[in-house]
Structures are given as C-alpha cells and as structure tokens.
C-alpha cells in the first residue's frame, strides 16, 4: 500500500512518513543527535558543511529567478522556501541545546511485528508514541502527525480476517442496540490505541507536571458514520494541557459547524500565530473558545 501522509507544504506534495519504529528512531536519535544534557558538545562539522552549501545555492536565487518563466518561478519559489526552512533547521543544530531534564536517549527499538490485527497495531503505536514523546522531551521535534489507521482501514480483530473498512459497510445496525456491534468493538480498540499514545506522553515528567500537560494532541476520524461515509458528527478530540491554555474534560456538540473550527482552535492552543483557517465555505476565524483557558 502507498504510505499515508498528511504532512504537506503545498497541498499537492506530501512528506514521506517514517513507517517503522526504527526509521523514526534514526530520524530523531540517529546520526547528528545532540544530547542536550551532555557536558561535551561541539558543532557537527557535517552540519556546518551542509549549511555552507545551502548558503551558496541560496545566493544564486535571484539569478535563477530572472532567467525562467512564471511557472518555473513558482516551482523555484517552493524549492527555495524548502531551502530556507532547512537552513533554519541547520542553524538550530549549530547552537548548543538548552539542557532538558526529561530527555533520556531511548534504546533502539526492535523490529516490530507486522500484522493488521488491531492489537498488534496498538502495540506498535505505543512504541512509536514512546519515541515521539521522548523526541518532544529532547526538543528533537515540536510538531508531528501520526496516523493510527488510514481512512479505508485494513485492521481487523485478532483471530478474524474481515477488515475494519469492510465491516463498517457490511454489518447491519443491531435492531435493539441501535448501532453496529463489531464496528463499535473495533472503534473501541482503536481508542485504546489512542489512550496508549497519551499514556506514553503522560509518563514523562516535565517541570511540575508531565509532557502531556505541556502539549496538545488533536485526534480525529474522517467520517461520522463510516457505513455511509457521513461527514456529520465527525468525532474530534483535544487532549493535553497545552501549557495551561486548554480547558479539557468537555464534550461540545456543534451540529452544522465547520470542522475547521476545531483545527483553528488546536493551532491557537498550540501557540501558532494564526487567525483563520480553511478554504472557501470551510474558512473560519472562529475558534471554539469554550475550551480555551
């Protein structure tokens, strides 16, 4: 299957995701990792060389822009935007990091079991969450996207073969219960995976609280009623304290409201300097202020 990614700069080109704990470990704690608590620190010569090369390329920007057409200018601008972001990242790597009491270099993970059984997916999710949490604690990253299962999920209940996506369409609604029992069982197990994700963030002590107290996690499904791919009542959750900015523990029912309001709320709670979000009829400047402290 083609890997799923929601990380994009242009809306058309998406970043390649790390699909295994080992790949994520190498990205966060592999070559070039600078332990913020190490007494011995010096700039990485390889980073200095890369910064020098990027600076030389950037200096040629104006010459290139004058010699190409409008369509190529757009492509070049995207390219140079990526270069500027990379230069900023390299500049950070050349600065001595501030000490981080919560940062502990994790052990290299073992090769995970590869199966679509939701219990296996949840175990792998916990491993990935542990690495991501320590990546935040060590200031290796401040924002990330994580996909537990894709929109057409191929996970299944242990011991069975019928996949989640197929069950949502084939299973009838129980006459007495008023819902789909097997679908609900799978949804419950997926939420257990989300709970495990939060537990790993909450397990790291940071200051007077935990890492989760200082973070915000925005989680969502892509349908409200999967059987018919309904876009009404899509479940969206905000977890974590966001450094005291998030008033958690509330259920807000907002029928007919744009889901982009929740996205805008999450970004503002996380400290992003953004006043509106979305496109066309989904564009909004109204965050959900009920959850803002």
Describe these PLM feature segments:
Residues 1-293:
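Ligand-binding pockets and gating/stacking loops
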């Amino acid at each position: 299957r083609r890997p799923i990614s929601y990380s994009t700069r242009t809306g058309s080109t998406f970043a390649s995701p790390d699909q295994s704990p080992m790949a994520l470990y190498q990205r966060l704690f592999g070559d070039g990792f600078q332990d913020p608590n190490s007494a011995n620190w010096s700039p990485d010569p390889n980073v200095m060389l890369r910064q020098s090369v990027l600076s030389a390329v950037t200096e040629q920007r104006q010459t290139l822009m004058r010699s190409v057409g409008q369509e190529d200018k757009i492509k070049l601008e995207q390219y140079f935007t990526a270069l500027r972001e990379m230069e900023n990242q390299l500049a950070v790597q050349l600065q001595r990091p501030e000490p981080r009491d919560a940062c502990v270099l994790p052990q290299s993970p073992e090769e995970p079991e590869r199966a679509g059984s939701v219990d296996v997916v949840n175990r792998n999710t916990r491993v990935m969450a542990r690495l991501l949490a320590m990546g935040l604690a060590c200031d290796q990253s401040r924002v990330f996207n994580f996909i537990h299962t894709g929109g057409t999920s191929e996970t299944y209940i242990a011991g069975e073969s019928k996949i989640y996506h197929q069950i949502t369409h084939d299973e009838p609604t129980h006459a007495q219960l008023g819902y789909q029992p097997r679908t609900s069982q799978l949804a419950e197990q997926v939420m257990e995976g989300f709970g495990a994700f939060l537990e790993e963030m909450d397990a790291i002590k940071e200051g007077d609280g935990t890492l989760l107290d200082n973070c915000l996690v925005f989680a969502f499904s892509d349908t409200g009623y999967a059987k018919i791919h309904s876009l009404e009542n899509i479940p969206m959750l905000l977890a974590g304290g966001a450094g005291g900015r998030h008033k958690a523990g509330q259920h807000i029912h907002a029928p007919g409201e744009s889901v982009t309001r929740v996205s805008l709320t999450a970004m503002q709670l996380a400290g992003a300097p953004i006043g509106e979000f979305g496109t066309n009829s989904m564009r909004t400047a109204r965050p959900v202020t009920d959850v803002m402290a």
